[in-house]
Amino acid sequence: MKQVGLRIDVDTFRGTRDGVPRLLDLLGQHGIQASFFFSVGPDNMGRHLWRLVKPKFLWKMLRSRAASLYGWDILLAGTAWPGRRIGAGNEAVIRAAAESHEVGLHAWDHYSWQAWSGVWPQERLALEVERGLLELERIIGRPVTCSAVAGWRADQRVVKAKESFDFLYNSDCRGTRPFLPQLGSGTFGTVQIPVTLPTWDEAVGTAVDIAGFNRYLLDCIHRDPGVPVYTIHAEVEGIAYADQFNELLTMAAEEEIQFCPLSQLLPADFSELPSGKVVRGELAGREGWLGREQLLTSGV
């Protein structure tokens, strides 16, 4: 069996309320455990509409048919009215996920992190993480041991800002395999587990059409020479394309692919991991900068 980390990002109120329960049902039917990363503060995702002036973002929204994919309640959330508190309004759903799956922090305010983390001082970065962490721990009633920043907006500043939270791992960037981020003076930070595979919205309309996506993704998994990690979104695979995701899980099992929580991808001895840095870069199918893996050593 080829092991693939399954990361589920939950960005919005509706994704939490409607998408997560559907995903829990599907994963239960297939006997799969995954890593859920929750946004728990205000749902202000509609404020991303200003990015429509950017050609790359406009094209992404058009080719992914964003209005029918996400729904207008998501696309307008937090614009004409204050964003609803995601965690406080969906505590039972989040606790249900935590009963059977690994649960980590995605963001306090997904929109704000994606829009402003690149210029925030380190103290503000740490404050945002702490605010979300305290809320998520209050909801599930136990320590949170992992995190994955919104939109992969991470660099070495973010790596350092998160060091005080003693996470087992972070999944803040795109890359090929788990690595130890190098800090100053020869020390290393919390393990990073990068996402290696394209997401639905990155691939559909550019590399493949909707009908061919499952086959495309499975072929990417078979070709992945590193440690495969796949990200889905509760707003996509948990709502509009839940049936397609169900088919993907069936096809994956038939092809000897086993999805698992990200923590199961870590070796027993972290000294075996390569060292590296999280640097800013770009990725086909995604607008703006994001964190990319830059390996410095190959590991054991």
Swiss-Prot record:
Gene3D superfamilies, A to Z: Glycoside hydrolase/deacetylase (3.20.20.370)
Pathway the protein contributes to: Glycolipid biosynthesis; 4-amino-4-deoxy-alpha-L-arabinose undecaprenyl phosphate biosynthesis; 4-amino-4-deoxy-alpha-L-arabinose undecaprenyl phosphate from UDP-4-deoxy-4-formamido-beta-L-arabinose and undecaprenyl phosphate: step 2/2; Bacterial outer membrane biogenesis; lipopolysaccharide biosynthesis
Chemical reaction(s) catalysed: 4-deoxy-4-formamido-alpha-L-arabinopyranosyl di-trans,octa-cis-undecaprenyl phosphate + H2O = 4-amino-4-deoxy-alpha-L-arabinopyranosyl di-trans,octa-cis-undecaprenyl phosphate + formate
Domain of life the protein comes from: Bacteria
GO terms under biological process: 4-amino-4-deoxy-alpha-L-arabinopyranosyl undecaprenyl phosphate biosynthetic process; lipid A biosynthetic process; lipopolysaccharide biosynthetic process; response to antibiotic
Residue ranges of domain NodB homology in the record: 2-260
Molecular function GO labels: hydrolase activity, acting on carbon-nitrogen (but not peptide) bonds, in linear amides
The EC number(s) this enzyme carries: 3.5.1.n3
GO CC terms in record: membrane
Key words, A-Z: Antibiotic resistance, Hydrolase, Lipid A biosynthesis, Lipid biosynthesis, Lipid metabolism, Lipopolysaccharide biosynthesis
Family (UniProt): Belongs to the polysaccharide deacetylase family. ArnD deformylase subfamily.
NCBIfam families: PRK15394.1
Function summary: Catalyzes the deformylation of 4-deoxy-4-formamido-L-arabinose-phosphoundecaprenol to 4-amino-4-deoxy-L-arabinose-phosphoundecaprenol. The modified arabinose is attached to lipid A and is required for resistance to polymyxin and cationic antimicrobial peptides.
The name this protein goes by in its record: Probable 4-deoxy-4-formamido-L-arabinose-phosphoundecaprenol deformylase ArnD
Gene, per the UniProt record: arnD
